[in-house]
Each structure stands twice: as C-alpha cells, then as structure tokens.
Amino acid sequence: MIDHIILTVSNVEHSLAFYEAALAPLDIKFFMPYKGENGHPDLWGVGNGKSAFFWLKHGKPDPRAIHWGFMAQNNAKVDEFYQAAIAAGAKVNISPRARMEYYSGYYAADVFDPDGYSFEVVHKS
C-alpha cells in the first residue's frame, strides 16, 4: 500500500490551487506545509484533513515519469472530479467511463494537470 507521493511541479501555488479544486469532490485538500531542513526540500501536503499523503515540491517536472490514481467512493464522485478538474484547467486525457479493458467494475476519468502529469480518479466495484 502506498503511503505518500511527492510530485515535482513548476509552480507550487498554481498546482496547489489546481489540485485543491480538482480533488474537492474527494474531500482532498491542502493540509500542511513542511519546511525542509537538512537538505530536505520544502513540501506542501495535500490530504484528508488528518494526514497528508500527496506532496508537492518545486522543481523541474517530468510528466513521463509517473502516473497515479486516487480512489473515489462511487462513479458519481469520478464524474464530479472530472468536472472539477476541467473547470480548474485540466486537459482531457480520458473522459469518465467504464474501463472494460481492465475489468467490468473499473470506472475512471484521467486528466493532465498544469505540468502535463497524467492522473486519474477511479471507482472499483
């Protein structure tokens, strides 16, 4: 099980605003800043209000290097995420739909963030 992800972004403030808006339907929001010490970079944590599991740091992004998915409670939350992400400036990768190529209970939407990273929100039933 994954505990956290650190994503390098070109503009932390812009990316933080994007992810807060796009992930609002999943109740994921900015949680805390972490001032790096002893060579550790400054991080901005996004999470569920109890802990941060998705961190942003400033640097040179490499969108080819990673893809990830957030879990949704149901298909409607996937659809809400998609609308929120597009409204926040995401570019379409794959619109919400059943992904029968994976298996019958896989429903997801996939977008590109401001730095070109591909990520999805998925409901598995």
Cite the ranges covered by each PLM segment.
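Active-site/binding-pocket entry motifs
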Residues: 51-52, 62
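Eukaryotic scaffold repeat domains enriched in small/polar residues
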Residues: 55-56
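Short amphipathic alpha-helices in soluble, non-transmembrane regions
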Residues: 18-21, 81-85
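Alpha-helical elements of the RecA-like P-loop NTPase motor core of helicases
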Residues: 16-17, 79, 119
